[in-house]
Amino acid sequence: MRSPADLARIFTTNVGFYRPLVTTSFAIDRALWNLDARGYALTNVTLLLGNAGLLFLLARVVSLSREGALFAAAVWAFNFHGINMALLWTSGRTALLLCLFAQAAALVVLSGRRWAPVLAGVLALAAMLSKEEAVLLPPLLVVLQLLSRRQSDARAILGNSWPLCAALLIYLLARGQSGAFTLVNAPEYYRPTFNLAAVLKNIGEYLDRGATFATVASIAAWLAARQGMTLTADERRTIRIGITWFVAMYAITIFVPVRSSLYAVAPSIGSALVAGAVASRAWRTAPARFARVASTMIVVIALLLPVYRSRNHGLVEPADLATQSLATIRTAVHDRPDARAVVLIDDPQAPVRLEDAFGALLPDAIHLFVNPGVRATLADAATPGSTDAETLLFHRRGGRLVPVMPDSQSLSR
């Protein structure tokens, strides 16, 4: 991105999905870090910490204790599902930005300030420009206001919702002119399905991914509280808000045939709020017992770090293969400046294949990381006569990509 015109094109170019703020964030990363993956990872970690902080503030705004709010933020951040993908996958940036803008919008509307409706509309639009699930944010924010006001004026709340409606309209118009996916022309695995069996399976899967960890934490906090002590009005209201958030943020994705744990990142904010309300009750009625339970949970999470790490192998192994492969190709092309093409021969029996590492983006990866003048082809076997003096051949050996000499002898490095 070198000019304002490039920025404008981000909002008008069809790349399938319509997530221009995510693309803009990557452009900023490119300007700061060039192609150093560690910089992109640092941005994702920063967004995760920012989201945890916003969840703490949101829990405080709905009147939870500091301890309950901190408990909610921890439950969300240490969920087994989704958070790891949001950090490790490039595409995970979408979920992190959605959560960031959605929570900021919720904080603003619940503040009750005079300027809140307009700012909430801007933040809701930013969330929509980050991920499609946010189209339900305008009605969700209206419902949250109705649930949170002790003496709510429904007419005033509905009257002040026009900036949210305007944000949705602007988003739909901008998306429509970009040519992005619609319900009609999206790939089949992204088109909504109303097959009852498929929807019920999705509901079960997403209840697990978005609520299991929060449920376990809630049970532990409930048992820590003094028995017979009821929830306060604020705690009950927070539970209603959390359930509403959870349902709204899943309302679209349960109808999408393809499942992804990334879809659980935003809804699990709601289940974390429920856990925070239960924890607030425990702290209020039995602070010493709650402190022991919370300390035990911290120790358990620390002991489970190897489990968290092992669950990420399937996410990082393709990235490791891509990094090693590009480094090998870059070295070989540097040694052969006359090379104009590379052919990569994959191992069909390998648990992680080059296709897993690059997908359809191998030419783009070679263009960015190696040389824009070099063509790239991925194959399962070399075709006799398919290479020439300007083509470099590579194949897999021992799980790694290695160059092949013209006499078929591998280079040893």
Task: Identify the residue ranges that each predicted region occupies.
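Polytopic membrane enzymes that build or remodel cell-surface glycoconjugates and lipids
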Residues: 1-413
